[in-house]
């Protein structure tokens, strides 16, 4: 069911995403579709599992991989100057460990907007 007149805005905040993951699982159970969705940081990462209609996917990422050194670690920082292992997060996870349904994501009838900030220029 398309929920007209309501947009979703998802904040960042790392582990706060676990709450959002549960909310999106409920939205999927009720088959709710929102026409406009805005995500920032972790909120943007979490929303894609909802848009691809993959219940439990975000929860599994958080429960099974956030503590993995490939996901976040000092060794990542020393190697790439980022705590996050983006190759692991954006390639290994969605392509192999927890496959992402790109086709279902593309078919989502609503629009996704993602807020970003350049770390140098703001």
What residues fall within each predicted segment?
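Patatin-like phospholipase
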Residues: 1-40, 48-122
